[in-house]
Amino acid sequence: MIRRPAVAGAFYERDPAALRRRIEWCFEHELGPGTLPAVGSMRRIKGVIAPHAGYMYSGPVAAHAYHELVSDGIPGTLVIICPNHTGMGSGVSLMQQGAWETPLGTVEIDSELAEAIVRESGIIDLDETAHLAEHSCEVHVPFIQYFTDNFRIVPVTMWMQGHETAADVGHAVASAIRETGRDAAVIASTDFTHYSPQDIAEATDRRIIDRITAMDDTGMYGVISELNATMCGYGPVAATIIASRILGATECDLLRYATSGDVTGDRSSVVGYAHLS
């Protein structure tokens, strides 16, 4: 099966040349890293947290994530863990077979790694339907395609985002990466506070990010509950923290935080975006 793009023409440009220009705009934007990265080969990064809104809003912050990832070396496989915004599919859904199409080309699914993740998990289902209309994995793929077509993906979407579920997903991903010997990194797809005034969003997100940089997934859940936070991808973030820790990561840094208000100038109701790795 080839999964067709669901949000081309909405979250990002449908025309390939225009999409490449938009990606360059994201990197060169004043809220972005300022330059396009050179492809490196160190391959130290185990996990990345990046936003998934429309490129005109969160693209510059996402560009920070991909500047660091590309500079470190593009992994052979990216396990992209995202929240389920549509309600379609099962509680945790993985697409195992086929490829994903974007305006920049087609990316194969790493079926062997996908199968290993499902085998290691007690909760992940093989389910294509959860991915068909979901934007929060799709928007990451063109950023890597801009630099290479030599990579594969494993898309995982989480409707169930409780801590036990995230722990299962994180352990399964890390165990499968080790079992298969893959050169892989994990991407957690999330936006932070939704539709609050800028000062409230920043204060709320700061508390959550403090726990993420400490790699304290338990504490992150506590803060989210305490503040009734509207972060949409807390389960993918927790799963990525857990997987990265198992794979040897010992630290996590905040590289960029901004809001939609920093782009549009309207700070009365914003969405928070962050890049951490």
Swiss-Prot record:
Gene3D superfamilies: LigB-like (3.40.830.10). PANTHER family: PROTEIN MEMO1. This is MEMO1 family protein MTH_45. It comes from the Archaea. HAMAP family: MEMO1 (MF_00055). Belongs to the MEMO1 family. CDD domains: MEMO_like. Pfam families: Memo.
